[in-house]
Amino acid sequence: VAIVNPKMPDSGYPFRDLAGCAVVWKLISALRFACLDVYKQPICLLNARPSNEAYVIEAVKLVNLVEVERISETVVPGMVSISQTRLVPFLQGQQILVWDAATQVRQLEKAFGKGVEFNCYDIATDIARDIPAARGASLLKLKDQSKIARYNGKPIGELDGFLNLFVTFLLRKNGTWGPREAEELQLVALGTLADLMPLRGENRILVRRGLAAMNERPRPGLAELLSRQGLAGKRVTTGDLSWQITPAINATGRMGTPERAVELFLADGPVPRQRLAEEVVRLNGDRKQLGADSWAIVEPLARASLPRFSERLAVAYGAGIHRGVTGIMANRVASAFKVPAVVICLMEDGTAVGSLRSARGFHLDALLEPCADLFIDHGGHAFAAGFSLRAERLDELLARLERLAADARLPDGDAEEELEIDAELPHEYLTPAILDLADRFEPYGEGNDQLTFAARGMKIVAADIMGKAERNHLKLTLDCGKYKWPAIFWQEAARLNRDFAVGDRVDAAFHVARNAFNGTEIPQMILEDVRKVEG
């Protein structure tokens, strides 16, 4: 078995940022594929088509459904024999599959005469049995219906459409996408979001498929956790998962009992799963309290460290910082001070364990790699990483980080404060239908922020302060003409009656979301910023 690590520079894999959980799932899928009859079987797809007064004969060789070689020959009838083309050595010994054999034989006879015989198999009937929409259609028509082709970046030909259709057919025929894979991809989606991997390329496709499967039928264990978090029956988004599900799962590891999350997804029967879901949520509550306690330690340490690290890095370390929340603390420090952050826990066994988080697009490799010889272990990616080392080497690490920070080049910090607006909407566009537009750009997450809209002159017709323990949040009702929108403004309750009040007209930047309550979904805005309209 050869295991490809996409992050290795010479791996040959086309997408470096594939999430670790996706690498594991693809390995499992590859091992399953190796058990199929098609494994290692050479297959050749051939297509002949007229082109002006000539014929174009194209063929592609596949091994394990991956293209390994292709040729294209343009033949003017009567000008060359088949032996003068590259077709004979290319096709020799191949299992040749065609679409609509009768038509293909006619085209080949016109190109080379009736003295040339091609032994080929018409796969069209087999494919139409599994994909009825393909029955009776030409490759010219089918190529434009290929979903795979949407990711090609350029228009595809008939042979490419044939190839995509054949791959889809074989995968369906062999049951490589079914309930089992739907459940597995839900875990891949959760892992990709939890690991803060960029939602581009394969990550985006895998998360989208996992999210769709989750909304159709959440897997055992996840269903109970969704219910416990008030998400049962709701159309779940990546935002819901990132805020309410992955933190709860991660909390089991942060609190030293990662096996609880594993048991939740493996348990038989609703009763043990319900009990485990309750325990996972409880552990997440404990983690939140631990985070609040740790922040009281971390924040002043990080603030005091800024001068030492040239105002380009914030560092906090100490025995009072719990190992399970170093990542959360580093993320919070980076957000608070707008610089990369390092938070380190001093362990009882004489080691120091740290987490790094990026800010302003800074790649953490520039901090990690020059210190690699100090670490017992380290890993992660450009924007989130971790390490461990012997505690006696901590001073040496801090000295190196001090030098590295002095030379670090961070993008202008002011850019962080700018809001990028995707579209300004007139009031007549502010209908619930705007949610359907936003849905098309899912999945949102790292590398694919939610669409941010702006609207001007909306009247505040109601305002309420919200919050359980601390009433820090604001709920406004904005009059947009035909519709009045509920609008949530997190952590901004203090701005009511200071920057704006009921009756004022405001300009606002926001994204749109659904608030599910008692089985009903209510459109709402999540405000990013609000500015009172003067005059």
Language-model segment annotations:
Residues 1, 72-133, 155, 159, ...:
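Conserved DEDDh/DEDDy metal-dependent 3′-5′ exonuclease domain
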Residues 127-131, 144-146, 342-358:
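Short glycine-cluster motifs
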Residues 304-331:
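Flexible, glycine/threonine-enriched loop-and-boundary segments that flank and lead into catalytic domains
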Residues 59-77:
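Short glycine-rich, Thr/Ser-proximal phosphate-binding strand/loop in the N-terminal lobe
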Residues 50, 57, 65, 208-247, ...:
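Acidic, two-metal ion nucleic-acid-processing modules in DNA metabolism proteins
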Residues 2-44, 48-57, 61-65, 125-126, ...:
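A structured phosphate/pyrophosphate-recognition subdomain
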Residues 1, 7-9, 101, 124-128, ...:
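Short, ordered loop/turn segments at secondary-structure junctions
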